[in-house]
Amino acid sequence: MKFSANWITSPKDSGAAVYTYQKSFSLRSAVKKATLYISAQGVYVPTLNGARVGAFVMAPGWTCYKTRTQYQTYDITNMLKEENTLSVGVGQGWAVGHIGYANTNHYFADFVALICEMHIEYQDGAKEIIASDESFDIYTSPVTFSEIYHGETCDMTAPIELVGKAKLTTVNTELVEQVGEDVTEQERLRPIALIITPKGERVLDFGQNMTGYVEVKVKGNRGDRIVIHKAEILDQDGNFY
């Protein structure tokens, strides 16, 4: 598909934080079919009216971004209401963040960017395209640092602030339709053991190696800080490695 949308980015450099790109819109009448086409320079998570769109993790996926970047296609027909808000969190990912084999940041690109468009077909035959442009609002998010190889920092007390209107930009890549399978969550694992190491560290053992992330529910006071470190093994003395 050839995009009619523009690449957009934040008027302020987001650094390693995740900014939210947001667009509110109204429907003219009853909808027959609606499709979202979307990609990013970085990684993105889309929501529509507060619900997650699709299940792809780390979209748009790994490619050589200097030559091609995949885009995803989502059927959003049943997610639409009379009044709607599309929100897309965009982070650095591989394109902008740290790349291990190159031992550098910004190996493919210097800034995050988003491109998307919604194709809406109404039951009366009318058609509409809502595309990324300068009308998108950019907001901060609780994710103040996000890096594939260096973890994530979330400040749930941080106020959500309007950064400004999106600005148009140029991304030197070819947008191509996704060629592989979706990368999605496959299972939810619970720890099989709680280990107290000789140093007094509390280690949750999940019983296997994996690619994933931790979900935790906690009680505490405003300003409390929770730090989770991950490792594959313990050292020879049984301490966290």
Locations of regions flagged by a protein language model:
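Extracellular/oxidizing-compartment recognition motifs
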Residues: M1-Y241
